[in-house]
Amino acid sequence: TEFATNDGGQR
């Protein structure tokens, strides 16, 4: 994802 999430997305 483009958003900083706790799922290991694209930060």
Curated annotation (Swiss-Prot):
Gene Ontology molecular function: any one: lyase activity
pH dependence: Optimum pH is 7.2.
Assigned keywords, A-Z: Heparin-binding, Lyase
Comment on activity versus temperature: Optimum temperature 45 degrees Celsius.
Positions in coiled-coil regions: none
Activity regulation note: Inhibited by Cu(2+) ion, nitrogen and lead. Activated by reducing agents, such as DL-dithiothreitol and 2-mercaptoethanol.
EC nos: 4.2.2.-
Record keyword Lyase present: yes
Enzyme class per UniProt: lyase
Keyword Membrane: no
The record's account of how the chain is modified after translation: The N-terminus is blocked.
General function of this protein: Degrades acharan sulfate and, to a lesser extent, heparin and heparan sulfate.
Quaternary structure annotation from Swiss-Prot or TrEMBL: Monomer.
Protein name, entry field: Acharan sulfate lyase 2
Protein's organism: Bacteroides stercoris
Taxonomic lineage: Bacteria, Pseudomonadati, Bacteroidota, Bacteroidia, Bacteroidales
